[in-house]
From Swiss-Prot:
This is Small ribosomal subunit protein uS4. NCBIfam families: PRK05327.1, rpsD_bact. HAMAP family: Ribosomal_uS4_B. Residues 27-47 are annotated as: Disordered. The keyword Ribonucleoprotein applies. It comes from Parabacteroides distasonis (strain ATCC 8503 / DSM 20701 / CIP 104284 / JCM 5825 / NCTC 11152). The gene is rpsD. One of the primary rRNA binding proteins, it binds directly to 16S rRNA where it nucleates assembly of the body of the 30S subunit. With S5 and S12 plays an important role in translational accuracy. One of its GO terms (cellular component) is small ribosomal subunit. It holds the Pfam family Ribosomal_S4. Part of the 30S ribosomal subunit. Contacts protein S5. The interaction surface between S4 and S5 is involved in control of translational fidelity. PANTHER family: 30S 40S RIBOSOMAL PROTEIN (PTHR11831), SMALL RIBOSOMAL SUBUNIT PROTEIN US4M (PTHR11831:SF4).
Length: 201
């Protein structure tokens, strides 16, 4: 399955929430897309509800099925609550950390910055969006990329204090992952236990 590159509002409407960030169209059309989207009311099965939650998590973090399955298996082997560990692993992806640091306006934009070699980890360029950032590592903007408009616009007025597990130094345009976030600190509206139940079938 290839990564979805179509209209993001259509996917957000499918889930009834702005999983990609603020969406003006979604606020006006908060119902499923399609000709009968505003009138369709079908009872969803338990499996359907669980599958929907997994799809929402995949779209939110921009992760493909195989990657998502691998992360779940890693989470299930780890100490701690599997669903919470899964979200921590998703949060620890380099593209997500770049997004949380405010370097990019969306996770998709963050993924592109990483792929195009604009981001460093501990001073070295890393171009793998799925790279797992470890606590204590420093994520920075490559020197020649610091003047990029997309980065400057994203950082302008960004509130870094909203994420207590990271810190940001504007002078060096770099940030540090202090620790993996607690579940209560992750703002995404994902019911991770439903995903655990789906994979446990």
């Amino acid at each position: 399955m290839a990564r979805y590159t179509g209209p993001r509002t259509r996917i957000a409407r499918k889930f009834g929430e702005a999983i990609f960030g603020a969406d003006k169209v979604l606020s006006k059309k908060n119902y499923p897309p399609g000709q009968h989207g505003n009138s369709r009311k079908r009872k969803t099965s338990e499996y359907g509800i669980q599958l929907r939650e997994k799809q929402k998590a995949k779209y939110t973090y921009g992760v493909l099925e195989k990657q998502f399955r691998n992360l779940f298996e890693k989470a299930s082997r780890s100490k701690g609550i599997t669903g919470e560990v899964l979200l921590q692993l998703l949060e620890g992806r380099l593209d997500n950390v770049v997004y949380r640091l405010g370097i990019a306006p969306t996770r998709a934009a963050a993924r592109q910055l990483v792929s195009h070699r604009h981001i460093t980890v501990d001073g070295s360029v890393v171009n793998i969006p799925s790279y797992s950032v470890k606590p204590g590592q420093v994520i920075g903007v490559r020197e020649k990329s610091k003047s990029m408009e997309v980065i400057a616009d994203a950082l302008s007025g960004f509130n870094h204090s909203q994420y207590p597990w990271i810190e940001w130094d504007q002078s060096s345009m770099s940030g540090k992952l202090l620790h993996l976030p607690e579940r209560a600190d992750i703002p995404e509206n994902i019911k991770e236990q439903l995903i655990v139940e789906l994979y446990s079938k």
